[in-house]
Amino acid sequence: MAVVKLSPWANYSSSKSEIKSSSSSSSSKSSLSAYVINVSSSPRLSFYNPYPRRLHHQRLSSPASIRCSVTSSDQIQAPLPAKQKPECFGVFCLTYDLKAEEETKSWKKIINVAVSGAAGMISNHLLFKLASGEVFGPDQPISLKLLGSERSFAALEGVAMELEDSLYPLLRQVSIGIDPYEIFQDAEWALLIGAKPRGPGMERADLLDINGQIFAEQGKALNAVASPNVKVMVVGNPCNTNALICLKNAPNIPPKNFHALTRLDENRAKCQLALKAGVFYDKVSNVTIWGNHSTTQVPDFLNAKIHGIPVTEVIRDRKWLEDEFTNMVQTRGGVLIKKWGRSSAASTAVSIVDAIRSLVTPTPEGDWFSTGVYTNGNPYGIAEDIVFSMPCRSKGDGDYEFVKDVIFDDYLSKKIKKSEDELLAEKKCVAHLTGEGIAVCDLPEDTMLPGEM
């Protein structure tokens, strides 16, 4: 993994005539040439010495660094060439004439975003949204730290090449690797997408254990090297219990910072309500997904609104709401697979963007959003010490608070209890991964979503 760090306000201009190589013509091809760079202002540029691609999971000591020092107001002199060939790509490896401009001077400090499963289909849609500024804003430069596996490493290189070819001004740094202790270093956001799919004949308990081990290790890595206030979004399924495992293995990170993605379910519920009412999607608000990201999830129509009016007053067919609507949301992924031949990737990426933006932008007055969060301190009577999807609001600072003004009826309470019981059973299944003793697996039924197959 190799990295070139650029000042967050610096801008590229490839005036190669101003770049003079200070390395001799006999320098090894495996060396990183040193350059003298003439600049019109005095930005700072620092290189980190690359090291070979990792082919096993083992934490390395910090790489040696190469730093440029300003010798005059118009010249930066790089030191001797590095000894190893960098594992980096295009503009993330080369040195350019850097000029400060008014636009980039106003940019925020660079943000470190780690993504696991970075060579997968969901990431293939998500990474370009992150790099474009769609997620964190047009003045937020970003460093992407991409985690893959030995098997996917060549594909991960291809992803990095595509990011290079896309010329995103806000994308200031890309690093790739297979060791979470490297990739999660100083991460301020961790989007944990990678997980093992369910194979033929695999019991749900087996998948909970296999993926649980992945998220236990990633939790330990985040605990050791990530920013102390890192925000963690768990996408890999079963995401609620994976998020619980991850947070239990990261005691230095506030449990409140962990989320399980249920935003795609919320988006699907909004879509079906809008179609039934004959309105556009943006007229639907206050939709909650309660519980587990499984077929026990509860799309809440009781508290939802259309044009600010309770859904039950707009759509007066209660039977449709309880039966057809609920079933459509719960099984939408399976229907999509039958039509498309693969699980949802693009819409999942969109929902990740929505979920992050709900945390980094203030929630509109009177509205809320769904996210799977740690239940301790919740006002709904949900059992504590699990990760459960509930309605939340945010002030736009990355934090959230529970919504208090929600109503329940017998139907909604009964459905929520079923999902709660399922998550409590899953928790017992992974007790060996959360530090709570011996695992006892007695899952009530197989409610795994089709996309987990």
UniProtKB/Swiss-Prot annotation:
Disulfide bonds, paired cysteine numbers: C88-C93, C429-C441
First-level EC class: oxidoreductase
Activation of NADP-MDH, annotated site positions: C88, C93
Regulation (activators, inhibitors): Chloroplast NADP-MDH is activated upon illumination. In order to be enzymatically active, disulfide bridges on the protein must be reduced by thioredoxin which receives electrons from ferredoxin and the electron transport system of photosynthesis.
Entry keyword annotation includes S-adenosyl-L-methionine: no
Function according to Swiss-Prot or TrEMBL: The chloroplastic, NADP-dependent form is essential for the photosynthesis C4 cycle, which allows plants to circumvent the problem of photorespiration. In C4 plants, NADP-MDH activity acts to convert oxaloacetate to malate in chloroplasts of mesophyll cells for transport to the bundle sheath cells.
Protein name: Malate dehydrogenase [NADP], chloroplastic
Organism in which the protein naturally occurs: Flaveria bidentis
Lineage, top ranks: Eukaryota, Viridiplantae, Streptophyta, Embryophyta, Tracheophyta
